[in-house]
Amino acid sequence: MRILLSNDDGVHAPGIQTLAKALREFADVQVVAPDRNRSGASNSLTLESSLRTFTFENGDIAVQMGTPTDCVYLGVNALMRPRPDIVVSGINAGPNLGDDVIYSGTVAAAMEGRHLGFPALAVSLDGHKHYDTAAAVTCSILRALCKEPLRTGRILNINVQDLPLDQIKGIRVTRCGTRHPADQVIPQQDPRGNTLYWIGPPGGKCDAGPGTDFAAVDEGYVSITPLHVDLTAHSAQDVVSDWLNSVGVGTQW
């Protein structure tokens, strides 16, 4: 199995390095990751400037000022030859649950892999300690995929509780929960008196009931949520069409 491995925490982050070490025990792994933390970069691409890369002695590649999506795009289309069999993103330091997937560079890297035609996993740890647990879970899933490919055409967003492996209860297939809207902005002043702003933490849990990714992780399970790239709200199409007809938009300007 050939694996393109990326993340949004940066090429030297403990999550990606722990996972790369574990994956290399049974797979051909190419790390292509940002040279710095790009958390929250979502699906952004660098289009108005060139991208430089640096290759370390162990073969890992850092994309200077690159986003997670840049890294996967370059990895698939230029840097990994032959091309990968699968794209894996993570292990993220912190969860990507519920609405987090909108902003997550970890999920975005996997989404870019899927957009380019490859199976893809995004892996996050609900903490900053037991990366080995998340790595073991990921390796188990990838070994299973080698034996029997999963042909859903979807991204698997995997969240692992920050526990020793023997305390993980199992795996649940879940849906995304939701958070309350975030509203915190943290102002500061620089030495010259100019105001600086920091984006605050995410909103608290809103829909975290049974069946959600929040609930599974809180209860000590691994959460696997299938995600897809198509954002069309199919159930709303008829509602919008009926509304346009009723208000006359499109018939009178």
Swiss-Prot record:
Cofactor(s) listed: a divalent metal cation
Chief place of localization: cytoplasm
MF terms (GO), sorted A to Z: 3'-nucleotidase activity; 5'-nucleotidase activity; exopolyphosphatase activity; metal ion binding; nucleotide binding
Record text on cofactor binding: Binds 1 divalent metal cation per subunit.
EC class name: hydrolase
Reactions this protein catalyses: a ribonucleoside 5'-phosphate + H2O = a ribonucleoside + phosphate; a ribonucleoside 3'-phosphate + H2O = a ribonucleoside + phosphate; [phosphate](n) + H2O = [phosphate](n-1) + phosphate + H(+)
Protein name per UniProt: 5'/3'-nucleotidase SurE
Gene source species: Shigella flexneri serotype 5b (strain 8401)
Gene: surE
